[in-house]
Amino acid sequence: MSYETITTTRTGNVLKLTLNRPERLNACPPQMADEIFDAVRDLDGARAVLMTGEGRAFCSGADLAANADKSGTGPINGGDRAFTSLQRHYNPMIQALASVPVPVVSAVQGPAAGVGCSIALAADFVIAGKSGYFLQAFVNIGLVPDGGSSWMLPRLVGTAQATRMMMLGEKIHGEEAERIGLIYKCVEDEALTAEAEALAEKLANGPTLALGLMKRNIRAGLESDFTATLLMEAQGQREAGMSQDSMEGAMSFLQKRKPAFKGA
């Protein structure tokens, strides 16, 4: 499918989704949110997703120019417009990214700011170059974090660091982001693309049905009690144990060879 604000390409089992408004540092208007939603809802058999940004930024946030009030009525109606835009465009996109049934990798260079931070962190694995940084810029314009930040950040880095990011609006550069557990890994800028592509390919060639169940269990486990989590794991093990990949894994172990998983 052809898009205007993103590009999608398929390499083997990996769907690469690139935010493609480099002249705006890949700022995300509602149209981009809708196109991301559409792209990840129809994977067409892809077994992993790699998200990148074209040019020198991952995503500089929502496109304030596209969302600006041109009516002259001022900020009062702005809150209503923001609510409607979030509910119609940005929240469905973030929910879709978080619900992708296969592994998602994001590769961050330059800013991942505002909703761009949420887009990046919605991935299962976030790799940043040393130039990459994560910014909750909302406080600088008198707004509150959105895009699921209030849910994601405390769970990733704890309430102290989440409060710092949201209330102080400080940039968290790649190396610090790795150190505090915000992201998976920070690498040299020139290694970012290769590292992210290699990880996405490795995941895509793995037992992606089981990986999808792991994703489900991790998310659900954040909200479930211990007993419910044990049951959920047992149910997942039953489902995974009936898969072709499980049979292939057992046979490859017995035959002392590398498994050839199919994601089924």
Language-model region placement:
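Conserved CoA-thioester-binding segment of acyl-CoA-metabolizing enzymes
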Residues: M1-E54, Q95, M251
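Helix-loop "lid/cap" segments that line or gate small-molecule binding pockets
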Residues: M165-M166, N217, G221, G236-G241
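Hydrophobic alpha-helical membrane-association signature
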Residues: M32-I36, L86-H89, L192, E233
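Terminal peptide-recognition signature
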Residues: L17, R21, E35-I36, M51, ...
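Crotonase-fold acyl-CoA enzyme core
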Residues: I6, Q95-L211, M242-S243, M247-M251, ...
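Glycine- (often His-adjacent) and acidic-residue-rich active-site loop
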Residues: G45, G53-A96, A112, G142, ...
